[in-house]
């Protein structure tokens, strides 16, 4: 009884302090938030930040998330003890985890926009974000183990730094968006310079069990400038500019990249089955359109027996245009000789097949003239092929190219894009070459 009274008094005190804090002018509130920053440049080596890629790591992340959401009222308890959403099945979603002494103690998921969209766009206006260009990802499914919630950001700050590093270096993402509880939004605004979206408040956010939510966005391209201005003159430990932009955190395990792919699919067929058919019945909740899209992503035979049944189309694999499991972004140079003059164009290759590719060019490209294209497919993987720009696409600056005879490096790359299932397969591309 006594403990109950004490805990109730503490809650009342916290509520009163929050109310008093809210009456302060916003610049003062933001300054107070920033004064609490304390970033450890050399965390305990037992802390490891990595992509959750094994069944065990993902299950630990989903369990931590479930328990955190239940305790906060963001979901009702699930019999599985896990919070797993359809978005976690997609190759465009990456789950990051923080492990301490081998145990998952923090997690967040990055849901990049795909044919499934992402949760937030159903209720918030993203028109201003889209107008700036660049890919968008939703930061979702954030949870920290109770044992580390009062440690001054010992898990949260490294996890957020990992998110920033991953999005800007590997995930080809310019904007991140969030939907957070109104009580938390000022922390994101003051420390990371999130800006509220149009019509930013939603009283009942279905993705969080009807809890209120505020939508906000962060332009990662602009973040260094904001952080430098806000934390100018601060010591390294008190500066998020130093922490996010200048510091290399030794605890972060960066993903390997043989090729310049921009996502990290981890869902092997058996893992899809385990999380969405066995531990949960997630696939049972999909409508026909969502099932068709799932088939269009996982069109390989080894996935077929695990995908949802009851699909009404006679051939589910043809119900939607086949979607890529891998995304990539490779630089290239296209050179032609025309009337004795050499012309060279800088390209960014974003889609490809065995005998062609789609690329963006900064300047207009002369079409219907054969030349040579050199594409940097990876840090140590270069393809040099005779090519022809066949025409400009409707989208500004995009051109289709035809290849005369793809070389070995190009064939390895395309074969793995078509037949691979996870990021690990990209590191073993030779085995996907046809006999």
Where are these regions (language model features)?
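Conserved GNAT acetyl-CoA-binding A-motif
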Residues: 167-179
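Conserved acetyl-CoA-binding loop-helix of GNAT-fold acetyltransferases
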Residues: 150-165
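Structured alpha-helical
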Residues: 2-12, 57, 79-84, 96-98, ...
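A short, internal acetyl-CoA/4′-phosphopantetheine-binding micro-motif in the GNAT/acyltransferase core
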Residues: 140-151
């Amino acid at each position: 009884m006594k403990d109950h009274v004490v805990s109730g008094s503490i809650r009342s005190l916290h509520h009163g302090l929050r109310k008093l804090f809210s009456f302060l002018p916003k610049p003062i509130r933001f300054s107070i938030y920033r004064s609490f920053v304390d970033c450890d440049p050399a965390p305990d080596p037992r802390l490891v930040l990595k992509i959750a890629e094994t069944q065990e790591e993902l299950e630990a992340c989903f369990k931590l998330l479930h328990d955190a959401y239940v305790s906060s009222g963001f979901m009702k308890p699930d019999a599985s003890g896990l919070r797993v959403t359809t978005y976690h099945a997609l190759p465009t979603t990456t789950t990051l985890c923080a492990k301490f002494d081998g145990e998952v103690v923090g997690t967040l998921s990055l849901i990049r926009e795909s044919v499934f969209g992402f949760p937030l766009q159903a209720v918030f206006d993203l028109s201003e974000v889209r107008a700036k260009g660049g890919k968008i990802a939703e930061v979702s499914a954030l949870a920290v183990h109770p044992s580390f919630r009062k440690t001054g950001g010992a898990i949260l700050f490294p996890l957020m730094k990992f998110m920033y590093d991953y999005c800007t270096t590997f995930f080809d993402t310019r904007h991140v968006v969030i939907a957070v509880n109104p009580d938390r939004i000022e922390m994101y605004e003051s420390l990371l310079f999130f800006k509220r979206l149009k019509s930013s408040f939603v009283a009942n956010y279905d993705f969080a069990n009807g809890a209120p939510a505020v939508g906000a966005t962060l332009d990662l391209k602009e973040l260094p400038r904001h952080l430098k201005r806000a934390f100018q003159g601060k010591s390294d430990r008190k500066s998020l500019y130093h922490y996010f932009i200048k510091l290399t955190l030794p605890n972060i395990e960066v993903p390997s990249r043989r090729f310049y792919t921009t996502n990290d699919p981890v869902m092997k067929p058996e893992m899809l089955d385990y999380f969405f058919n066995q531990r949960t019945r997630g696939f049972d909740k999909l409508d026909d359109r969502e099932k068709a899209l799932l088939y269009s992503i996982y069109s390989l035979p080894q996935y077929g027996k695990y995908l949802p049944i009851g699909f009404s189309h006679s051939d589910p694999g043809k119900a939607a245009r086949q979607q890529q499991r891998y995304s990539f972004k490779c630089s290239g140079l296209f050179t032609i000789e025309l009337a004795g003059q050499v012309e060279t164009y800088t390209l960014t290759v974003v889609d490809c097949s065995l005998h062609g590719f789609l690329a963006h060019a900064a300047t207009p490209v002369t079409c219907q003239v054969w030349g040579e294209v050199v594409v940097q497919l990876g840090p140590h993987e270069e393809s040099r092929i005779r090519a022809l720009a066949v025409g400009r696409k409707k989208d500004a600056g995009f051109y289709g190219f035809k290849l005369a005879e793809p070389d070995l490096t190009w064939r390895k790359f395309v074969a793995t894009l078509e037949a691979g299932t996870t990021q690990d397969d990209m590191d073993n591309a030779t085995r996907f070459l046809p006999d």
